[in-house]
């Protein structure tokens, strides 16, 4: 789903692009209506470069996912701290989506989180999902308030331990998907 998708290649017949913002999509569509009895196995979240959106997208996507599924968050390991601000100040910008990864790690220790240090901004791989969990939705306002003014606290190479960073190679990928 994307309100303004920029797709430059032909998609297979089974692919479906929904021209809609994610909040509206999850509020107006039911998983069963779109997928029948099947749960979602893979979700890639590359949203609005704002942690509130990424956190809400994760929570909504997890509710649609299979427990064995995988959710991947993009733009959570900025190259430089200046690119991690909520408002764009640099040419290369990831926004404050990194906060969503920290919030998920802190509030959902039941999840398996591994971060692949892929250039230019990392991929957070989240497994062992619990589609019945409502914890992030229940704590959403408090989490947003807690992290609203937070600055990215790490320099390149000093990766956050709570995100369990792995190399962007075959071994790291096996670890992330393990």
Give short role names for the model-derived ranges.
Residues 46-49:
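Switch II (G3) loop of P-loop NTPases
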Residues 1-31, 77-80, 85:
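SAM cofactor-binding core of SAM-dependent methyltransferases
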Residues 9-10, 17, 34-35, 63, ...:
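Structural motif
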Residues 11-15, 39, 109-111:
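A short helix-to-beta-strand connector/capping loop
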Residues 5-8, 31-34, 60-61, 114:
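Short, flexible, glycine/charge-rich loop motifs used to bind or transfer phosphoryl groups or to couple energy/partner
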Residues 52-178:
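C-terminal substrate-binding/active-site "lid" region of AdoMet-derived donor-dependent transferases
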Residues 18, 44, 72:
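Conserved Rossmann-like nucleotide-binding pocket used by diverse enzymes
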Residues 29-43:
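A short acidic, Gly/Pro-enriched loop at the edge of an enzyme's catalytic core
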């Amino acid at each position: 789903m994307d309100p303004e998708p920029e797709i430059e290649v032909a998609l297979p017949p089974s692919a479906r692009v929904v021209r809609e913002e994610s909040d509206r999509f999850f509020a107006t569509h039911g998983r069963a209506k779109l997928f029948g009895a099947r749960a979602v196995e893979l979700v890639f979240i590359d949203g609005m470069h704002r942690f509130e959106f990424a956190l809400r997208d994760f929570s909504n996507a997890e509710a649609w996912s299979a427990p064995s599924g995988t959710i991947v968050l993009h733009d959570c390991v900025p190259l430089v701290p200046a690119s991690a601000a909520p408002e764009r100040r640099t040419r290369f910008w990831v926004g404050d989506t990194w906060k969503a990864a920290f919030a998920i790690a802190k509030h959902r220790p039941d999840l398996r989180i591994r971060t692949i240090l892929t250039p230019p901004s990392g991929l957070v791989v989240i497994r062992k999902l619990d589609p019945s969990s409502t914890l992030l939705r229940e704590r959403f306002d408090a989490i947003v308030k807690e992290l609203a003014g937070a600055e990215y606290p790490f320099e390149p190479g000093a990766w956050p331990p709570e995100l369990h960073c792995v190399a962007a190679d075959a071994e790291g990928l096996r670890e992330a998907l393990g």
